[in-house]
Swiss-Prot record:
Family, similarity comment: Belongs to the LanC-like protein family.
Record-given protein name: LanC-like protein GCL1
General function of this protein: May play a role in signaling. May be not involved in abscisic acid (ABA) signaling.
InterPro entries: 6hp_glycosidase-like_sf, LANC-like, LanC-like_prot_euk
Source superkingdom: Eukaryota
Residue span of region Disordered: 1-22
Gene for this chain: GCL1
GO biological process terms on file: carbohydrate metabolic process; peptide modification
Gene3D superfamilies given in the database record: 1.50.10.10
Length: 433
């Protein structure tokens, strides 16, 4: 029996601490998968992940799109959230992931319908330009899905909208131009817009969003980081989000650096990016090896993508690929993965702060190293979710409108299960390019 099997068996089901024990919420179809002969081995076969993903994807669509839109139309539901992160556009992303694995054209049709609805809402309600939490997500997914469907007119329409976003004056404005109105982070700021551009170029071809639009934004992010670190001798780049110097992937250094690593960097830029990563590596918590949530924060509690070792593991894995001669990045990525293995089986399910996001750290390390132990660990976490995802949501949820969302709910495990059909091709949704 592999170490991944031993670990999950020892952890047991959520609720063993008395917090919700005996209150299991049954899901007949998905629970049926666990009655297979392979279930006692904990790590389920690929076919089971695919079936579980398809079943739960259908539930996500029913809850957020079919039933959800009806509730909105009747006035009985919440205001439509048109974002990838917690909103309806996350369902579109999930359907796109399903289509790419199964080639079910109904998924592509559903995705296109959702995007059209979100486009109408986002135009009036969303001021941000990022992929995860802004209009960049609508434009990007709209162009990609239209391209898959062979709809050149709609593809060009959404691409045109994205290029209009690129003209936002604050995007390339550095500190010397007074560019402090827009943040630098992945969720709401400049890095989040650049991520959307990288995603578009991946699907539609390099140069779809041209370098002359992106390079000034990269320069503005680097300049802002240097100004932010002007009073800090040890760290070359620092950024504030609502006054706090976050380190994590969502609003902090890990996410910003991950995006910067995809662009051509000058010798000075490389020195500052590497120096910032090494500053973070040298200031890990000495006992656990975990990373602080923010500069100077002494609390060692969170192991997740948004804050802590998970996001850093993925960013360091990328740094190792970009700088293969710098062996310390590879070693630090592996060490961060060990933190996730020891402490990452948490009581939430989503990509941002739950087990699904933590499993992606192992998939990133699997692609980096080729070591099957990381594939086994990802499957162990994913198998735990097959058993307990819906129960975990019911135990921990205080925001029912996010229960099926991509980053805080059940759509996250769906994407993870689909990615386990071909782990070598896996990508953390909205983070890895």
């Amino acid at each position: 029996m592999s170490s991944s099997v031993d670990f999950v068996t020892e952890q047991g089901r959520c609720g063993d601490d008395g917090n919700g024990a005996g209150e299991t919420v049954k899901n007949g179809e998905i629970d049926h998968l666990l009655s297979e002969p392979s279930a006692p081995t904990i790590s389920l076969p690929t076919e089971s992940f695919l079936r579980a993903a398809t079943l739960l994807k259908n539930q996500v669509v029913e809850a957020t799109w079919k039933g959800g839109v009806e509730a909105l139309a009747s006035g009985s539901g919440p205001v439509l959230d048109p974002t990838v992160y917690t909103g309806l556009l996350g369902t579109a992303f999930t359907c796109l992931k399903s289509y790419e694995v199964t080639r079910n054209h109904q998924d592509l049709l559903t995705c296109a319908e959702i995007i059209d609805t979100c486009a109408n809402v986002a135009r009036a309600t969303t001021r941000h330009v990022t992929f995860l939490c802004g209009r960049g997500g609508v434009c990007t997914l709209g162009a990609i899905v239209a391209n898959y469907r062979g709809d050149q007119s709609k593809r060009d329409f959404f691409l045109g909208l994205f290029l209009e976003l690129a003209e936002e004056r604050e995007l390339p404005a550095g500190p010397e131009e007074g560019g402090f109105g827009m943040s630098y982070d992945l969720l709401y700021g400049r890095a989040g817009f650049l991520w959307a551009a990288l995603f578009l170029n991946r699907y539609l071809g390099q140069g779809t969003v041209p370098d002359h639009l992106l390079s000034p934004i990269v320069a503005a992010i680097l300049a802002g980081g240097r100004v932010g670190a002007a009073d800090h001798e040890a760290c070359p780049l620092l950024y504030r989000f609502h006054g706090t110097r976050f380190w994590g992937a969502a609003n902090g250094l890990a996410g910003i650096l991950y995006v910067l690593l995809h662009f051509p960097l000058s010798e000075e830029d490389v020195k500052d990016v590497q120096g910032t990563l090494r500053y973070m590596m040298s200031n890990r918590f000495p006992n656990s090896g975990n990373y602080p949530c923010s500069e100077g924060n002494p609390r060692d509690k969170l192991v997740q993508w948004a804050h802590g070792a998970t996001g850093m593991a993925i960013t360091l894995a990328k740094a190792s690929q970009v700088f293969p001669k710098e062996r310390d990045f590879r070693e630090a990525a592996i060490e961060a993965g060990e933190v996730v293995w020891k402490s990452g089986l948490v009581k939430k399910v989503g990509l941002a702060d739950g087990v699904a996001g933590n499993a992606y750290a192992f998939l990133s390390l699997y692609r980096l190293t080729g070591d099957v132990v990381y594939e086994e660990r990802a499957k162990a976490f994913a198998s735990y979710l097959c058993r307990d995802a819906i129960e975990l949501v019911n135990m921990t949820s205080q925001e029912t409108e996010h229960d099926y969302s991509l980053f805080r709910g059940l759509a996250g495990p769906v994407c993870l299960w689909f990615d386990l059909v071909s782990p070598v091709d896996s990508k953390f949704p909205g983070y890895e390019i």
